[in-house]
Design a protein with these regions (language model features):
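Terminal signal-anchor or tail-anchor transmembrane helices
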Residues: 2-26
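Low-complexity, charge- and small-residue-enriched intrinsically disordered regions
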Residues: 23-30, 268-274, 354
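Membrane-embedded and extracytoplasmic architecture of multi-pass membrane proteins
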Residues: 101, 282, 318-320
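C-terminal lobe of the eukaryotic/viral protein kinase catalytic domain
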Residues: 253-266
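C-terminal/domain-terminus segments
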Residues: 238-240, 296-300, 348-354
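Rossmann-fold NAD(P)H-dependent dehydrogenase/reductase core
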Residues: 9, 22-256, 340-349
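C-terminal helical subdomain
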Residues: 111, 263-315, 325-333, 337-338
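C-terminal helix/juxtamembrane-tail motif
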Residues: 6, 14, 322, 333-354
């Protein structure tokens, strides 16, 4: 009897997996997105590997000029070389370009240096893809005396976006795409822990918990930014790439690590598939209606195919904190204080919002 029940469970689980892969993981149509990006300039953070690399590759093959904003310049140069080879193989009709530039989001000085350098080049910026993100176990403090995950995943992107708002405004229509995760639904905005950047109060938290918190911050920030940018020609959208094959499993407790790895291998998207949400958010022509949206599976299907396919609805909604004005304001004001945004910078940003 036990074997029969076990067999039935395995069979049922197999059917669920196959249905999920057939319905949710089926290829997304790109028929309705803009595939000729000639003259467009895009910055993709964390573009040396994973979703960021796949996003940059696709945009470059669609004739965009893509800047790989990376912490590790050696890895960035290798990614640049591979993309350039892809472009050469497409022949003279492909005019895409790829550049690599140093950006360490865990250093406020590096973020300022990158933004200042780009602004001095006096060229447009049509899309800023805030893709970089990671996870660390244990408490790591940056040179700015802030918790590493908090700064690298959220705060650095907050500062970068504010410093480039003037350029984005000059380049309208333009967009800011914040790559979040379904894990943001497990996060929370802890005013005590993150009010001073998250050090002592976060020392007892698991890395995966802190990662979820920062992914929530990405969504809340993107939503608040969309409200401030309304009517300017610059839109802000956050995206969930789906359950993507990554190295996050190594940070799980040993008791569930093997099970999570098995489940991931059965139902997870590849990084190429996971990049589709970012690519669609960056290139879909219906940019005005995208402002403030959180794009997960169903939203992407509606944009590209006119109808939702279904899926795990509970993971496709965004956290209620994104709709809470007080929490959005708290996060914005805290980030502005911790990044020491100058009066000049804030005034310039306000000019964009107004």
């Amino acid at each position: 009897t036990m074997r029969r029940w076990l067999g039935a469970f395995v069979a049922l689980f197999g059917v669920v997996v196959l249905q999920y892969k057939h319905i949710v993981l089926a290829p997304i149509s790109l028929e309705h997105v803009q595939q000729d990006l000639t003259g467009k300039v895009v910055i993709v953070t964390g573009a040396s590997s994973g979703i960021g690399y796949e996003t940059a590759l696709r945009l470059a093959t669609w004739n965009a000029t893509v800047i790989l904003a990376v912490r590790n310049m050696d890895k960035g140069a290798r990614a640049q070389g591979v993309i350039q080879q892809e472009l050469r193989e497409k022949g003279d009709r492909c005019v895409g370009r790829v550049e690599v530039s140093h950006l360490d989001l865990a250093s406020l000085q590096s973020v300022r240096r990158f933004a200042n350098s780009f602004e001095k080049e006096n060229r447009p910026l049509h899309a800023l893809v805030l893709n970089a993100g990671g996870i660390t176990n244990g408490l790591h403090v940056t040179e700015d005396k802030l918790e590493y995950n908090f700064q690298a995943n959220f705060l650095g992107h907050f500062l970068l976006t504010n410093l480039l708002l003037k350029v984005l405004k000059r380049s309208t229509p333009s967009r800011v795409v914040s790559v979040s995760s379904m894990m943001h639904l497990l996060g929370r905005l802890d005013t005590d822990a993150y009010g001073e950047g998250g050090t002592d109060a976060l020392s007892m938290r698991d890395g995966l918990v802190r990662y979820s918190d920062t992914k929530l911050m990405n969504v809340v920030f993107a939503t608040e930014l969309s409200a401030r940018l309304k009517g300017t020609g610059v839109v802000s959208v956050s995206v969930h790439p789906g359950y993507v094959i990554s190295n996050l499993d190594q940070h799980l407790p040993p008791a569930i690590k093997s099970m999570a790895t098995l489940f991931r291998n059965m139902v997870a998207r590849s990084t190429k598939e996971g990049a589709m949400t970012s690519i669609i958010a960056t290139t879909h022509p219906d940019w005005e209606t995208m402002n403030g949206r959180y794009l997960a599976d169903d939203c992407v299907m509606e944009l590209c195919e006119g109808a939702a396919r279904g899926g795990w609805k509970m993971w496709q909604r965004r956290h209620s904190a994104a709709d809470d004005d007080s929490q959005r304001q708290w996060l914005w004001n805290t980030a502005a204080r911790l990044t020491n945004l100058t009066i000049h910078c804030m005034a310039a940003a306000q000019a964009v919002w107004d």
